[in-house]
Amino acid sequence: MIYIVGIGPGDREYLTLKAIKIVENADLVVGSKRALELFNIDEDKKITLTKNLIGELKELIKNENIKNKKIAILSTGDPCFSGLLKTLLKIGAKKEDIEAISGISSIQIAAAKLKISWEDYYIITLHGKEENRKKLLNLIKNHEKVIFLPNNLKEDAKFLINNGINPDTKIWVLENLTYENEKISLKSLKEIANGDFSYLTVCVYEGDEEI
């Protein structure tokens, strides 16, 4: 059985008891170096993923030697939103061989930090989804509230400006949520287009200003 384990936004305090239990009982634990460091795992049980993540996961699910083992694959945030569930299904894993363990998403943390009800917001990920930039553009043009995970925040901001959004439009930028270097700032698109930001970023547009 393959368990896709949501590990939350990064701080160990946001791990669920279920996630900890699954990892403790797993025969193999697979994840990025940063994800693996959240747990106390014997070295012989670890598999560290690299930038060739898709190729490595393909090899893993095709490996006959793991068929009867408990495999925990660590997914940042929640595996069902911009996480590894979709990736695994795309590369050939079968739903009946998978159990998804929910985790706390950075979207939820961002909403808590800004004290907003995320049920009132559209939620979009731009991670590897060029077409979603257009969706984001239309939402902002229509003054809709939106929480989004940027792909390249600087370039995303330039895209919005180049397609008619006022450069002074304000966006909340929440970087490295739950880490010691967490930073939350309200910036204009113009400032964002000229800035540098962490790749661990959530953005929030509150939808209540003139474009």
Curated annotation (Swiss-Prot):
Keywords: Cobalamin biosynthesis, Methyltransferase, S-adenosyl-L-methionine, Transferase. Pathway: Cofactor biosynthesis; adenosylcobalamin biosynthesis; cob(II)yrinate a,c-diamide from sirohydrochlorin (anaerobic route): step 8/10. The keyword Coiled coil does not apply. It is an enzyme of class 2 (transferase). InterPro entries: 4pyrrol_Mease, 4pyrrol_Methylase_sf, 4pyrrole_Mease_sub1, 4pyrrole_Mease_sub2, CbiE, Cobalamin_biosynth_MTase. It holds the Pfam family TP_methylase. Its EC number is 2.1.1.289. GO terms for molecular function: cobalt-precorrin-7 C15-methyltransferase activity; protein methyltransferase activity. CDD domains: Precorrin-6Y-MT. GO terms for biological process: cobalamin biosynthetic process; methylation. It catalyses: Co-precorrin-7 + S-adenosyl-L-methionine = Co-precorrin-8X + S-adenosyl-L-homocysteine + H(+). Belongs to the precorrin methyltransferase family. This is Probable cobalt-precorrin-7 C(5)-methyltransferase. The lineage of its organism: Archaea, Methanobacteriati, Methanobacteriota, Methanomada group, Methanococci. The gene is cbiE.
